[in-house]
C-alpha cells in the first residue's frame, strides 16, 4: 500500500479562520479527515504533519525519505524564499508535489515565484483543497520515487 506524507507549512493550521474568501471555510482537520477518507477508499496510507517552523519542515522532508513513497507539500509562504527547503527537497530521492490552495499567480506579485517548484515533480495551484487529492493521484500513478 503506498504511503505518502502530506506536509503543510506556516499558517495552514489557520485554515477556516484565515482569509476564508481565499482559502475557504474548511479547517486543517476537515482537510485531513477528507483526505483520510479519500485515501482509505483508494487503499493509500497518509500521514499528516503541519508546522509553522522551517526547520521542522526540513526535518520532516529528510525523515520522509526512509518512511514514505512521496510527499504532498503545501509550503505556504516559504515557497517564495526558502532556499533551505529547496535544498531539503533536492536532497531526497522522493517525488514532492507542491500544492497551493489559492491561485498564487492571481495574487500579490511576491507570490508569483516559487523557489521550490524547480526541485519538485510538479506544482498544483488554485484548485482549492482538491489540489491535495490531485497530487496524491499523481504520486500513486508514478510510484512516488524520483526517476
Swiss-Prot record:
Pathway: Metabolic intermediate biosynthesis; chorismate biosynthesis; chorismate from D-erythrose 4-phosphate and phosphoenolpyruvate: step 3/7. The record marks 18 as: Transition state stabilizer. GO terms for biological process: amino acid biosynthetic process; aromatic amino acid family biosynthetic process; chorismate biosynthetic process; quinate catabolic process. It holds the Pfam family DHquinase_II. Substrate binds at residues 74, 80, 87, 101-102, 111. GO terms for molecular function: 3-dehydroquinate dehydratase activity. Keywords: Amino-acid biosynthesis, Aromatic amino acid biosynthesis, Lyase. It is an enzyme of class 4 (lyase). Its EC number is 4.2.1.10. SUPFAM superfamilies: Type II 3-dehydroquinate dehydratase. The keyword Nuclease does not apply. CDD domains: DHQase_II (cd00466). The active site is at 23 (proton acceptor), 100 (proton donor). It catalyses: 3-dehydroquinate = 3-dehydroshikimate + H2O. It comes from the Bacteria. Belongs to the type-II 3-dehydroquinase family. PANTHER family: CATABOLIC 3-DEHYDROQUINASE. Catalyzes a trans-dehydration via an enolate intermediate. This is 3-dehydroquinate dehydratase. It comes from Bacillus pumilus (strain SAFR-032). The lineage of its organism: Bacteria, Bacillati, Bacillota, Bacilli, Bacillales.
Amino acid at each position: 500500500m503506498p504511503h505518502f506524507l502530506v506536509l503543510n507549512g506556516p499558517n495552514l493550521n489557520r485554515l477556516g479562520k484565515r482569509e476564508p474568501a481565499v482559502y475557504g471555510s474548511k479547517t486543517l482537520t476537515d482537510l485531513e479527515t477528507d483526505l483520510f477518507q479519500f485515501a482509505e477508499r483508494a487503499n493509500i496510507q497518509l500521514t499528516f504533519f503541519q508546522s509553522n517552523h522551517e526547520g521542522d519542515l526540513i526535518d520532516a522532508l529528510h525523515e520522509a525519505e526512509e518512511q514514505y513513497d512521496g510527499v504532498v507539500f503545501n509550503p505556504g509562504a516559504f515557497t517564495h524564499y526558502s532556499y533551505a527547503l529547496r535544498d531539503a527537497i533536492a536532497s531526497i530521492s522522493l517525488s514532492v508535489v507542491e500544492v497551493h490552495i489559492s491561485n498564487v499567480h492571481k495574487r500579490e506579485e511576491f507570490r508569483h515565484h516559487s523557489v521550490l517548484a524547480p526541485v519538485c515533480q510538479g506544482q498544483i495551484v488554485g484548485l482549492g483543497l482538491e489540489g491535495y487529492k490531485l497530487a496524491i493521484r499523481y504520486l500513486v500513478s508514478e510510484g512516488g520515487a524520483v526517476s
